Amino acid sequence: MNAWEVYEADLGWGAHPVVIVSHPARAARKALVEILDCSSQRANRPPHDHEVLRDGADGLDWPTFCKCDCIYAVPRTELGRQRGTVTIERRRQIVRTVITTHGWNVL
């Protein structure tokens, strides 16, 4: 399991794609990994300030949103099928959006 891989997980509202955003060392060997939830619905609007648009290049079947305003810690055993890996440019967008959404850019 590696940072920036896309898996399926059920966080309590049905199976959705999720992105591992843990430090690579944590993603590789710790019991808990940090993830961002992604929409399972096809994106049919522009992304909100807390979202990044992802698509087939990231292992998804259609364009969808990665929600960057809430980081979840879940047991790695809760992650299901691997869907793909987030592209480098999209990783940069996600990191910028997480920082801005949490207000860390003003520190």
Give residue ranges: language-model regions:
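Compact nucleic-acid interaction/catalytic patches
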Residues: 10, 14-54
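C-terminal terminal-subdomain/extension
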Residues: 57-107
